[in-house]
Amino acid sequence: MNHMVQYQHLDQSFAALSDATRRGVVEHLVRSDASVGELAERFAMTLTGMKKHIAVLERAGLVATEKQGRVRKCRLGPRRMEEEAAWIERYRQMWDARFSALDGVLEDLRVRT
């Protein structure tokens, strides 16, 4: 499988979550759904600015929106970030193993001196 295709979801998710406001929106939506206007007010930004953030999160599948009358409601999207969590865990384990090996080397050096 092509690397670009294989990691497309990861790229979109990590790019979407690279912004503090967008991470804050996801954290807020974990607790409760909210309208775009409510989110804009909560994060002290314009409606237009918040719509742009929501669009990025929506393209990544992290947020879903639905028009309810004149209000656009936001909720967590269909993606559960399992692929992202698995990728992070794989690298966390690799770094743990490397640090454990380094600890062993340092302990050997300490014992020798």
Where are the language model's segments positioned?
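Beta-hairpin "wing" of winged helix-turn-helix
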Residues: E58-G69, K73-R75
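Amphipathic alpha-helical dimerization/coiled-coil segments
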Residues: M1-H9, E27, E82-T113
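A general lysine-centric signal
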Residues: K51-K52, K67
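Residues in the helix-turn-helix
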Residues: G49, V56
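A cross-family signal for key residues in well-ordered alpha-helices
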Residues: A15, E27, E58, A64, ...
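Active-site phosphate/pyrophosphate-handling residues
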Residues: G24, A55, S100
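N-terminal helix-turn-helix DNA-binding core of bacterial DNA-binding proteins
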Residues: N2-T48, V71-A86
